[in-house]
A protein has these predicted regions:
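Generic start-of-chain signal for non-secretory N-termini
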Residues: 1-19, 26
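Long, highly charged, low-complexity intrinsically disordered interaction regions
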Residues: 3, 61-79, 89, 414, ...
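Short, ordered loop/turn segments at secondary-structure junctions
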Residues: 37-39, 128, 237, 320, ...
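Duplex nucleic acid-engaging cores and interfaces of nucleic-acid transaction enzymes
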Residues: 49-52, 59, 63-317, 323-428, ...
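Structured, non-catalytic alpha/beta "coupling" segments that mediate domain-domain communication
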Residues: 73, 87, 98-101, 224-239, ...
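A glycine-rich phosphate-binding loop feature that marks nucleotide/adenosyl-phosphate handling sites
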Residues: 177-184, 318-322, 376-378, 407-414, ...
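Single-stranded RNA-binding regions, centering on S1/OB-family and related RNA-binding modules
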Residues: 548-552, 556-714
Length: 714
């Protein structure tokens, strides 16, 4: 079986689709480029499918490397038979490869190894191969200074047999089947940890079938275990008879050695086999839980990154605070800092009048078009201050026309202390940088959030407990997907944002910014080829994802790739018009038969993509940010009452429900069972991050800081 066929089988694709995708990846094409511009080659695989092919190929390569290591190790021992080589070479199952390797795997000194060193291997094999012979008589021949009596000889032989049974493929697979059907995961409180482990009280005496254990419960138990609060185990629900089933292939009933072998099998099960398979299932279940948690994290991150921007506006950003005051910044349409100051409207200074006067002055001076307020400490109080300006007569500033937004502060402090922020604002402290970040998040969430480690943004589920490498790989792919799905303004994008554009990376991104600083704005995509070290391949990969508003060539501000400009120009010419007219008049495009322009390289999928771009050239798929206001009566958990219906914003979606910001410090939870008047399996079917929702308060636990909400209408 070829690698391509194997991957095609696993992903339910055609061999040709996998072959074409792997060829493009090998040639240096990126996942966004392949899914967008090479649909004819791949049979129109979408980005998820292309990424899945790349991921499966990575796993297969890892297995190939492992198989090579295993073969070399066994061969070095002089024990590699032709049959074993063939079985390992032809296997595509990592578990099977490890089972085949296990008898030859270097180990710490075991009981069986000690017994072999004492010359008891022949006795063990005699018991297995000639069970009708008297074991005690056979054992007498193996007595030495190290093996003083028959009991010691038989014990050593049983140790060897136990290890042999535990390393036998059939034994391991038999027990795996039992675990697969019957395994139960259990957790118990570690004695004396009652107070320290309070947050794990749900798991003090918990058990459930492993196959039904959700990722968040499994990760919670494993975290409690790693913190020394819980003991977690995985075992079949009913272990009676399991050791007998393991022994059956090795024991011949009614023979002299049957009891010895049965005893060895019981030892093999309890001491070696069961712990080994438990470890295996613990690792597998943890990996599956990791994958699910990472999937949810990536999904939340994508929704956050693709949140609607306000766009190019003159924005006032406010990072609120009490004692240290509120840092205020004013930005121009490009997000450049024009001014910064600090006001003290809250405790302890309570200089509200001066603060209001400063805001009025800045709004007029910098022609402010929107206000972004951080949603952290003093956020609601600062929002109330700014909204109060609407009721004050002021001929110079019409506050009714200035929308006010509460913006998530998650990760802002991480950004403000980062090297990226220091490079952008070397002469300003972290408070100014934080306020700028809040304002820029409103203007363009994607462009600002890519500067922050996704793990600091606050939409993960047990993110510190999952595989760090797998998490980084998934989140990097998510950021790359979002950046390329939206497209990037070549003349305003930061180096950090450009880094995620298909085919670029950090070095070329910085070269683009340096070129722009030296030569001014790019007039065309073609000018990219003048950027140092940006060659034809990089241009091919990145050009379609970079936009130039007001470019001389109208397609330079669309997702149409430069390699297809000539085709679109020919369509215009054949229709008796020019390119600008073709784009401006859909009725002309409607008369064009796309099938006339199909070739081996350009089929209907690509032509339909081009047509969709011409319908809305330069369109931002994210829409525009909408104003939202929390309930004015609610400022803390103490203001909540059962039955209250409140506006809220979804901040995090998990497998067990959605967390909702009510404009107070404590987030409320809408449990999955309360998301709708119907059964909901996956909360993501109903809600997503940044969604504005209406919720009803069903329970308030002030002592534990928990708020239960419902979105049910009935």
């Amino acid at each position: 079986m070829t690698i391509q066929h194997l991957i095609a089988q696993r992903l339910n694709l055609r061999d040709k689709q996998v072959e074409a995708t792997l060829k493009l990846l090998d040639e240096g094409a990126t996942i966004p480029f392949i899914s967008r511009y090479r649909k004819e080659a791949t049979g129109a695989l979408d980005e998820v499918q292309v990424a899945a092919v790349a991921d499966e190929y990575r796993k297969v390569q890892e297995l190939e490397h492992r198989k090579t290591f295993v073969l070399e190790t066994i061969e070095a021992q002089g024990k590699l038979t032709d049959e074993l080589r063939q079985r390992i070479t032809q296997s595509w199952d990592a578990t099977e490869v490890e089972d085949l390797y296990l008898p030859f795997k270097p180990k710490r000194r075991t009981k069986a190894q000690v017994a072999r060193e004492r010359g008891l291997e022949p006795l063990a094999q005699k018991l297995l191969l000639r069970p009708q012979d008297d074991p005690e008589l056979a054992a007498e021949r193996f007595l030495t200074d190290e093996v003083p009596d028959v009991a010691a000889a038989l014990q050593g032989a049983r140790d060897i047999i136990a290890e042999q049974i535990s390393e036998d493929e059939r034994s391991r697979q038999s027990l795996r089947n039992v675990f697969g059907r019957e395994a139960v995961i259990s957790s118990k409180l570690v004695k004396g940890k009652e107070e320290e482990a309070a947050k794990y009280r749900d798991y003090f005496d918990w058990s459930e079938p492993l196959r039904r254990c959700t990722s968040h419960r499994l990760l919670a138990m494993r975290r409690g275990e790693s913190e020394g609060m819980l003991r977690v185990s995985i075992a079949p629900a009913d272990e009676s008879g399991t050791a007998d089933r393991i022994a059956r292939p090795f024991v011949r009933p009614n023979t002299a050695a049957a009891a010895q072998i049965a005893t060895a099998a019981a030892d093999a099960y309890k001491r070696l086999l069961r712990p080994s398979i438990e470890t295996e299932f613990a690792a597998q279940s943890k990996q599956q839980a990791d994958e699910e948690a990472i999937r949810v994290f990536a999904q939340n991150l994508q929704q956050l990154l693709l949140a609607a921007p306000l766009g190019s506006r003159r924005i006032m950003g406010i990072d609120p605070g009490f004692r240290t005051g509120c840092k205020v910044v004013c930005l121009d349409e490009q997000g450049d800092l024009l001014h910064n100051t600090t006001i003290y409207p809250h405790e302890p200074k309570k200089d509200r009048a001066a603060a209001a006067a400063t805001l009025q002055k800045l709004a007029k001076q910098y022609r402010v078009e929107a206000v972004a307020i951080g949603n952290g400490t003093a956020g609601r109080e600062t929002e109330e201050l700014v909204r109060s300006l609407k009721s004050q007569a002021n001929a110079e500033v019409n506050w009714d026309e200035i929308p006010i937004f509460l913006v998530s502060e998650d990760g802002a402090s991480v950004y403000s202390a980062s090297a990226v922020a220091r490079a952008e604002f070397p002469d300003h402290d972290v408070t100014v940088r934080g306020a700028v970040s809040i304002a820029r998040r409103l203007a363009d969430p994607l462009a600002e959030l890519v500067k922050i480690d996704p793990k600091a943004i606050g939409v993960g589920q047990y993110q510190h407990d999952v595989d760090a490498t797998a998490l980084k790989r998934a989140l990097d792919h998510t950021v790359e997907h979002c950046v390329n799905a939206v497209g990037v303004n070549l003349n305003t994008a930061s180096a950090h944002l450009l880094t995620y554009v298909s085919g670029l990376g950090a070095a070329l991104a910085q070269n683009i910014v340096n070129y722009r600083a030296e030569h001014g704005a790019f007039a065309s995509r073609k000018e990219l080829l003048k950027v140092p070290r940006l060659g034809a391949k990089a241009f091919e990969q990145c050009a379609g994802f970079l936009r130039i508003p007001q470019a001389k060539h109208p397609l330079d501000n669309t997702a149409v790739h430069p390699e297809r400009y000539a085709l679109v120009e020919k369509m215009a010419s054949d229709a008796g018009t020019d390119l600008q007219t073709l784009i401006a008049h859909p009725e002309i495009r409607q008369k064009i038969d796309l099938k006339r322009y199909c070739t081996a390289e350009v089929g209907l999928p690509t032509l339909h993509d081009i047509w969709a771009e011409l319908d809305k050239p330069g369109r931002d798929p994210r829409g525009t940010a909408q104003v939202f206001q929390f309930e004015e009566r609610v400022h803390s958990i103490d203001d909540l009452e059962i039955g209250m219906v409140l506006p809220g914003v979804v901040t995090n979606v998990t497998n067990f429900g959605a967390f909702v910001d009510l404009g107070i410090k404590t987030k409320g939870l809408v449990h999955v069972s309360q998301l709708a008047d119907r059964f909901v399996k996956d909360p993501a079917e109903v809600v997503q991050v940044q969604q504005q929702v209406e919720v009803r308060v069903v329970e308030v636990d002030k002592a534990r800081g928990r708020i239960a909400l419902s979105m049910k209408k009935g």
